């Protein structure tokens, strides 16, 4: 019973410690203060692509899996996206295709 109590106390202590610091991080974030626990504060909010943007990106991907920088800039301008968004979309799409091919080859 003593060993059981010690293990539980350690778990509970860790939980309390984590909860206190997590809550403090949340409070500071709500007040607008930077905190080491609020790593997401520097990230932009996720914005899903519109159906039109996705359709155009998919069409371009079917035509060419790899884009030149000029083409990437052109697509970004046409779809009102950043060059980085287009670049990452194509990277993610290539990985998706790779996973699909792997799943088909090894059912």
From Swiss-Prot:
Compartments where found: Nucleus
One term of GO molecular function: RNA polymerase II cis-regulatory region sequence-specific DNA binding
Keyword Transport: no
GO CC terms in record: nucleus
PROSITE patterns the record matches: HOMEOBOX_1, HOMEOBOX_2
Primary location: nucleus
Nucleus found in the keyword field: yes
DNA-binding region(s), chain positions: 42-101
Coiled coil: none
Protein keywords: Developmental protein, DNA-binding, Homeobox, Nucleus
Xref: Gene3D superfamilies: Homeodomain-like (1.10.10.60)
Domain of life: Eukaryota
Family of the protein in this entry: Belongs to the Abd-B homeobox family.
Protein name: Homeobox protein HB4
Species this protein is from: Tripneustes gratilla (Hawaian sea urchin)
